[in-house]
Swiss-Prot record:
Protein known as: Proline--tRNA ligase
Role summary: Catalyzes the attachment of proline to tRNA(Pro) in a two-step reaction: proline is first activated by ATP to form Pro-AMP and then transferred to the acceptor end of tRNA(Pro). As ProRS can inadvertently accommodate and process non-cognate amino acids such as alanine and cysteine, to avoid such errors it has two additional distinct editing activities against alanine. One activity is designated as 'pretransfer' editing and involves the tRNA(Pro)-independent hydrolysis of activated Ala-AMP.
Major enzyme class: ligase
Keyword Ligase: yes
Length: 576
């Protein structure tokens, strides 16, 4: 491909609204342009990268025996009503109506559609296991699109779904897909960590996210360097160090705390550790009001709470709603379970410890409050607090380390949630009808592209892994006149005829401009022929990842091809 015949709108300046490297460099390198909030145009260079990522995904999926499909993006509301997710998906799902007043969703995921499609096609255990996938545009009505294509409203996803006669078969495919995902991300040049995760509205039992450690990550990962445990903080069980709770006064008495509503204010006013206090969180869902008590130095983990109560979402109660329960906003004392509100106590609390708690009276707290003495019918304690760095590993009790991460893939064991909803059954070996069990496996294609940039950039620009670079080799020629141009074209044709992906920068611009563009875009290998070549036969080969250039006297095309191919193989070997 010749640059003179290509769209190559590189930019010197960073876009004003870009706050992360991938967003800045995708725009500056001419890979994409913004359409509107969370929507992007992909230009030829960017599209080539996406196509290569898709091809790697396709190859590894096909190796597992998965079959590729293509389903409609527009999905009838009936499918979502049948699974119970028309409401559960919340405001992030785009919903539209046609001229006949029929409702549809722009598919954010396709469990329902594949279930509807495959129900009449699967009749016997002999048809199983079946693993199906597609690579398709999805939609999510993000309230705040950010970080370029990392969190956008329209995105490309590989979504796969597997159907099984039993959990043993599901686990075999789950492990096969787990291995395939590691291979996909390795081939894309990404270092990923599989972490235990919350299944959310997808449902099911086991769930793992493939995370890339990055300071811009929106997820918090908790990792154990001792045993290798890894988990999203949303999922991590809280295991506290015993010394987290210090001694406190045993005498029970009410104390004045004028204007002190928060735990920080109360503990500072009384000169006590936050860990010796109890705080309350007041929430409501569509079906119930919820009152959660936890240790004052901890935060409520909404994902754990929602999973425990099997609710999709919750929001804070208003002061009026709190008062309806006979409680004083800002000064809520521990209460016993009752029929007005669902009461939960976090397992970080000790039943026999004398805590400082609110007195359910304006501007007063009580010290020496022992739960097992003061709260009748104390319920079983639940794990609903957020684990943090320094808390203990649930496997080996070593301290956990926190990292920020970007999710690029997610695999689930869905169980029978969708097969039951759609009545998907087959006859087993004994002729008995069996409800199938499912798995689900997703990869964000655009997000993978952007995350590679986050991991592989420097002050000059991007350095793509050779597997997904828009072109493997760029030929930069600095010529004067027809004769020199023709010689450069000979180099281009020879390289191209060796089945190398070559991008020839034959534009009539200065040498500095060409060299900087090649480094900004991130072509893995650069061959430069310029003034030194036409004077004394000297050419150079540049390794973008190593930022290293080697100059040598041209000794024929066979020698040049050997040098380029050697570097090419070296760069591919790094991805294995």
């Amino acid at each position: 491909m010749k640059a003179s015949k290509y769209i190559l709108p590189t930019e010197k300046e960073n876009p004003s609204d870009a706050v992360v490297a991938s967003h800045r460099l995708m725009i500056r390198a001419g890979l994409a342009r913004k359409s509107s909030a969370g929507l992007y145009f992909y230009l030829p260079l960017g599209l080539k990268i996406l196509q290569k990522i898709k091809q790697i995904i396709r190859e590894e999926m096909n190796k597992t025996g998965a079959l590729e499909f293509d389903l409609p993006i527009l999905t009838p509301s009936d499918f979502w009503e049948q699974s119970g997710r028309w409401t559960a998906m919340g405001k992030e799902m785009f919903r539209i109506k046609d001229r006949h007043d029929l409702s549809y969703a722009l598919g954010p995921t396709h469990e329902e559609s594949f279930s509807f499609l495959l129900k009449p096609l699967l009749k016997s255990y002999k048809d199983l296991p079946l693993n199906v996938y597609q690579i398709q545009t999805k939609f999510r009505d993000e309230i705040r699109p950010r970080f370029g294509v990392i969190r956008s409203r329209e995105f490309i996803m590989k979504d796969a779904y597997s159907f099984h006669i039993d959990d043993v078969s599901l686990d075999e495919t789950y492990q096969s897909m787990r291995a395939a995902y590691r291979k996909i991300f390795d081939r894309c040049g990404l270092k990923t960590i599989p972490v235990q995760a919350d299944s959310g509205s997808m449902g099911g039992s086991a769930s793992e996210e493939f995370m890339v450690v990055s300071p811009i990550g929106e997820e918090t990962l908790l990792l154990c360097n001792s045993c290798g445990y890894s988990s999203n903080s949303e999922k991590t069980p809280l295991v506290l160090k015993k010394e987290n709770v210090s001694s406190a006064s045993v005498e029970k008495k009410e104390i004045s705390t004028p204007g002190k509503k928060t735990i920080v204010e109360v503990s500072a006013f009384l000169g006590i550790p936050e860990s010796t206090t109890i705080k309350a969180a007041t929430l409501k869902s569509e079906k119930k009001k919820i009152l959660v008590y936890l240790r004052g130095d901890l935060e409520l983990n909404l994902h754990k709470l929602h999973s425990l109560l099997r609710i999709v979402d919750s929001e804070p109660m208003t002061d009026a709603e709190i008062r309806e329960l006979g409680l004083v906003p800002g000064f809520i004392a521990p209460v016993a379970p009752n029929d007005k509100v669902k009461v939960l106590y976090d397992r970080s609390l000790q039943k026999d410890f004398p805590y400082v708690v609110a007195s359910n009276k304006e501007d007063f707290h009580t010290q020496g409050f022992v739960l097992e003495k003061e709260v009748s019918g104390l319920p079983e304690f639940a794990d609903v607090a957020l684990a943090r760095e320094g808390d203990l590993c649930p496997n080996c009790n070593a301290p956990l380390k926190a990292e920020k991460g970007i999710e690029v893939g997610h695999i689930f064991k869905l169980g029978e949630k969708y097969t039951k909803a759609f009545g998907i059954q087959v006859l087993d070996q004994n002729g008995k009808a069996r409800t199938l069990t499912m798995g689900c496996y997703g990869i964000g294609v655009n997000r993978t592209m952007a995350t590679v940039i986050e991991q592989r950039n420097d002050e000059k620009g991007i350095f793509w892994p050779i597997s997904i670079a828009p072109f493997e080799v760029t030929l930069v020629s600095i010529t004067k006149g027809e004769e020199q141009y023709s010689k450069a074209e000979e180099f281009y044709n020879v390289l191209k005829n060796e089945n190398l992906e070559v991008f020839w920068d034959d534009r009539d611009v200065g040498p500095g401009f060409k060299l900087k563009d090649s480094e900004l875009i991130g072509f893995p290998i650069r061959v430069t022929i310029g003034k030194k070549f036409f004077e004394n036969g000297e050419i150079s080969i540049y390794n973008r990842k190593a930022d290293k250039e080697e100059s040598f006297v041209f000794a024929g095309f066979e020698n040049l091809i050997a040098r380029v191919e050697s570097l090419r193989q070296e760069l591919f070997a790094e991805l294995e």
